[in-house]
Amino acid sequence: DRIGLDTRISRKESFLLANDGLYLGRLSLNTSTPDSISNNENIYGSHFSSISFKNRYSIYGSPSSSLSPYNPNTLTPPVIYLRGEKIGCLSKNVNLTNRVDPDVLNEWMIISDYLISFPYRKIHKFPIVNWELMYLVGQMLMPSFKTTGVIVVSDNFFRHH
Protein backbone atom coordinates (compact mmCIF):
# COMPACT_ATOMS: atom_id res chain seq x y z
CA ASP A 1 0.00 0.00 0.00
CA ARG A 2 1.53 3.28 -1.12
CA ILE A 3 -0.54 5.63 1.02
CA GLY A 4 0.92 6.30 4.45
CA LEU A 5 -0.85 6.33 7.80
CA ASP A 6 -0.62 10.11 8.16
CA THR A 7 -2.23 10.60 4.74
CA ARG A 8 -5.10 8.24 5.59
CA ILE A 9 -5.66 10.03 8.90
CA SER A 10 -5.62 13.49 7.28
CA ARG A 11 -8.13 12.25 4.68
CA LYS A 12 -10.31 10.97 7.54
CA GLU A 13 -10.38 7.48 6.08
CA SER A 14 -11.75 4.44 7.90
CA PHE A 15 -9.52 1.39 7.87
CA LEU A 16 -7.86 -1.46 9.75
CA LEU A 17 -4.19 -1.34 10.71
CA ALA A 18 -2.29 -4.38 11.94
CA ASN A 19 -0.33 -3.88 15.14
CA ASP A 20 2.88 -4.26 13.13
CA GLY A 21 1.86 -1.24 11.02
CA LEU A 22 0.56 -3.05 7.93
CA TYR A 23 -2.55 -1.60 6.28
CA LEU A 24 -5.29 -4.28 6.32
CA GLY A 25 -7.90 -2.54 4.18
CA ARG A 26 -10.63 0.07 4.09
CA LEU A 27 -13.69 -0.33 6.31
CA SER A 28 -16.33 -0.26 3.62
CA LEU A 29 -19.43 -2.26 2.78
CA ASN A 30 -18.87 -1.45 -0.89
CA THR A 31 -17.65 -4.62 -2.61
CA SER A 32 -16.47 -2.58 -5.62
CA THR A 33 -14.03 -0.41 -3.66
CA PRO A 34 -10.54 -1.67 -4.61
CA ASP A 35 -9.16 -1.78 -1.05
CA SER A 36 -12.40 -2.61 0.78
CA ILE A 37 -12.38 -5.47 3.28
CA SER A 38 -15.76 -6.39 1.74
CA ASN A 39 -14.23 -6.95 -1.71
CA ASN A 40 -13.44 -10.68 -1.78
CA GLU A 41 -11.44 -10.23 -4.99
CA ASN A 42 -8.71 -8.03 -3.49
CA ILE A 43 -5.82 -8.72 -1.11
CA TYR A 44 -7.67 -7.19 1.86
CA GLY A 45 -10.95 -9.07 1.58
CA SER A 46 -9.79 -12.41 0.19
CA HIS A 47 -9.85 -15.55 2.32
CA PHE A 48 -6.63 -16.59 0.55
CA SER A 49 -4.49 -13.45 0.83
CA SER A 50 -1.48 -13.52 3.14
CA ILE A 51 -2.35 -10.03 4.41
CA SER A 52 -6.08 -10.52 4.97
CA PHE A 53 -7.51 -11.00 8.45
CA LYS A 54 -10.11 -13.22 6.75
CA ASN A 55 -7.43 -15.82 5.87
CA ARG A 56 -7.32 -18.15 8.88
CA TYR A 57 -3.86 -19.36 7.79
CA SER A 58 -2.20 -15.93 7.61
CA ILE A 59 -0.51 -14.17 10.53
CA TYR A 60 -3.33 -11.61 10.36
CA GLY A 61 -6.14 -14.16 10.58
CA SER A 62 -4.82 -17.23 12.38
CA PRO A 63 -6.35 -17.95 15.81
CA SER A 64 -2.82 -18.59 17.08
CA SER A 65 -1.22 -15.36 15.80
CA SER A 66 -0.74 -12.41 18.14
CA LEU A 67 -1.59 -10.06 15.23
CA SER A 68 -4.92 -11.74 14.48
CA PRO A 69 -8.35 -10.57 15.62
CA TYR A 70 -9.30 -14.25 15.93
CA ASN A 71 -6.78 -14.94 18.71
CA PRO A 72 -8.89 -14.73 21.89
CA ASN A 73 -5.81 -13.95 23.99
CA THR A 74 -4.00 -11.41 21.84
CA LEU A 75 -3.07 -8.03 23.22
CA THR A 76 -2.03 -6.78 19.77
CA PRO A 77 -5.08 -7.08 17.48
CA PRO A 78 -5.72 -4.88 14.43
CA VAL A 79 -6.57 -1.28 15.23
CA ILE A 80 -9.78 0.32 13.93
CA TYR A 81 -9.50 3.84 12.52
CA LEU A 82 -12.78 5.59 11.84
CA ARG A 83 -12.70 8.87 9.96
CA GLY A 84 -9.03 9.16 10.76
CA GLU A 85 -9.40 8.51 14.48
CA LYS A 86 -8.12 5.48 16.35
CA ILE A 87 -11.24 4.24 18.17
CA GLY A 88 -10.66 0.63 19.11
CA CYS A 89 -9.65 -2.77 17.88
CA LEU A 90 -10.94 -5.77 15.98
CA SER A 91 -10.67 -8.71 18.35
CA LYS A 92 -12.13 -11.84 19.91
CA ASN A 93 -10.38 -10.96 23.18
CA VAL A 94 -13.28 -10.11 25.50
CA ASN A 95 -10.89 -8.43 27.95
CA LEU A 96 -10.04 -5.62 25.54
CA THR A 97 -12.03 -2.39 25.61
CA ASN A 98 -13.50 -0.72 22.54
CA ARG A 99 -13.39 -3.93 20.58
CA VAL A 100 -15.48 -5.16 17.70
CA ASP A 101 -15.77 -8.91 17.22
CA PRO A 102 -14.48 -9.76 13.72
CA ASP A 103 -17.40 -12.12 13.13
CA VAL A 104 -19.90 -9.26 13.39
CA LEU A 105 -17.89 -6.46 11.77
CA ASN A 106 -20.13 -6.24 8.69
CA GLU A 107 -23.28 -6.30 10.81
CA TRP A 108 -21.81 -3.57 13.04
CA MET A 109 -21.11 -1.41 9.97
CA ILE A 110 -24.61 -2.03 8.54
CA ILE A 111 -26.42 -1.14 11.76
CA SER A 112 -24.19 1.85 12.34
CA ASP A 113 -24.84 3.07 8.81
CA TYR A 114 -28.58 2.87 9.38
CA LEU A 115 -28.37 4.71 12.71
CA ILE A 116 -26.35 7.63 11.41
CA SER A 117 -28.04 8.07 8.05
CA PHE A 118 -31.63 7.79 9.27
CA PRO A 119 -31.97 11.42 10.45
CA TYR A 120 -30.86 12.68 7.04
CA ARG A 121 -33.43 10.66 5.13
CA LYS A 122 -37.06 11.60 4.64
CA ILE A 123 -38.75 10.05 7.66
CA HIS A 124 -42.05 9.28 5.91
CA LYS A 125 -40.27 6.70 3.74
CA PHE A 126 -39.42 4.49 6.72
CA PRO A 127 -41.46 2.38 9.12
CA ILE A 128 -41.42 3.08 12.84
CA VAL A 129 -37.94 2.54 14.24
CA ASN A 130 -37.38 1.11 17.70
CA TRP A 131 -34.36 3.18 18.74
CA GLU A 132 -33.96 1.30 22.02
CA LEU A 133 -33.70 -1.97 20.12
CA MET A 134 -31.17 -0.49 17.70
CA TYR A 135 -29.12 0.78 20.65
CA LEU A 136 -29.20 -2.66 22.31
CA VAL A 137 -28.10 -4.33 19.08
CA GLY A 138 -25.25 -1.82 18.86
CA GLN A 139 -24.21 -2.72 22.39
CA MET A 140 -24.24 -6.43 21.53
CA LEU A 141 -22.07 -5.93 18.47
CA MET A 142 -19.63 -3.59 20.22
CA PRO A 143 -19.78 -3.79 24.01
CA SER A 144 -18.43 -0.25 24.36
CA PHE A 145 -21.09 1.20 22.04
CA LYS A 146 -22.72 4.25 23.65
CA THR A 147 -24.94 7.04 22.42
CA THR A 148 -21.69 8.90 21.75
CA GLY A 149 -20.15 5.80 20.22
CA VAL A 150 -18.84 5.25 16.76
CA ILE A 151 -21.35 4.93 13.99
CA VAL A 152 -21.06 4.62 10.24
CA VAL A 153 -21.93 7.53 7.99
CA SER A 154 -21.82 5.58 4.73
CA ASP A 155 -20.25 2.50 3.30
CA ASN A 156 -16.95 4.34 2.84
CA PHE A 157 -16.50 6.40 5.99
CA PHE A 158 -17.57 6.71 9.59
CA ARG A 159 -18.20 9.41 12.12
CA HIS A 160 -18.62 10.00 15.85
CA HIS A 161 -22.12 11.19 16.60
Model-based region annotation:
Residues 1-161:
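Repetitive, compositionally biased segments used for assembly/scaffolding
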